[in-house]
């Protein structure tokens, strides 16, 4: 298996420095042709949602259209994305420097994400929990 420094750095990032996770990921990648090895494949295997999907989710929430939100949530789930991953990655995005948002909105969104995570832990239905999350986000974000 041919691995370059870019792939090694990506593995280190997604495994968060956990050697066992890195080894498991390498074992999984070894079963895949090295010609296909790229960062997108690693993200897919690790269940990482592409950033453009998260940003689009937030943009759809800004439109404050309930029918569109239902379609967005259904498409998100049909694409196989994890609501837990959405909550984690959205929290990271909101707290990053790349997110141009007032601090007050960021705090409200983080609180909503925390509530959503609790609902998931308590066994909430992913579709309903995700739709609830989208509706609450749309209440916080200003309309386009």
Residue ranges and their predicted role:
Residues 36, 40, 47-49:
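Conserved beta/loop motifs at nucleotide-recognition and modification sites
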Residues 56-144:
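Helix-rich C-terminal "collar"/helical-bundle subdomain used as an assembly and partner-interaction module
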Residues 34-36, 100-101:
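Short, glycine- and charge-enriched coil/turn segments that flank and shape catalytic ligand pockets
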Residues 1-6:
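Conserved small helical "lid"/interfacial subdomain of P-loop NTPases
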Residues 14-15, 80:
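Residue-level hotspots within the lipid-embedded alpha helices of multi-pass solute transporters
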Residues 8-14, 20-32, 41, 54-59, ...:
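C-terminal helical "lid" of AAA+/P-loop NTPase domains
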């Amino acid at each position: 298996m041919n691995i370059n420094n870019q792939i090694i750095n990506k593995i280190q990032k997604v495994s968060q420095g956990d050697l066992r996770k890195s080894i498991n990921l390498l074992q999984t990648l070894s079963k895949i042709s090295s010609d296909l090895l790229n960062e997108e494949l690693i993200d897919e295997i690790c269940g990482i949602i592409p950033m453009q999907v998260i940003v689009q989710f937030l943009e759809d929430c800004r439109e404050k259209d309930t029918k569109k939100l239902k379609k967005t949530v259904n498409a998100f789930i049909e694409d196989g994305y994890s609501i837990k991953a959405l909550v984690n990655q959205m929290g990271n995005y909101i707290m990053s420097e790349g997110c141009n948002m007032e601090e007050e909105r960021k705090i409200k969104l983080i609180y909503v994400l925390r509530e959503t995570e609790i609902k998931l832990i308590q066994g909430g239905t992913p579709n309903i929990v995700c739709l609830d999350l989208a509706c609450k986000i749309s209440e916080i974000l200003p309309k386009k």
